[in-house]
């Protein structure tokens, strides 16, 4: 059962990432990988909420492991950061990598606080 939940959540998460990433890339054409940045930060906030919500195992498996596991993307983050360095966009690369890490941690903590404020935990 858990494999099916991860697969279903993963399908929804990857489609959501694809659609949002595409829309952001079409709207904002910059050298900065804004789509992946937005997706990973919002994913960190959502994971903070979900991991603090006290969900029963199947719901967490569907949303946390499945949906958010596929929604966020570490491999694309690394690929884009590396390409920025190779393209001599060193300032953008540093801003992207450090900004993603710092805002990811802050976003996760913010999600935990949101869960507390709405009395999920």
Predicted regions, residues:
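Membrane-interface helix-loop junctions in multi-pass transporters/channels
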Residues: 1-121
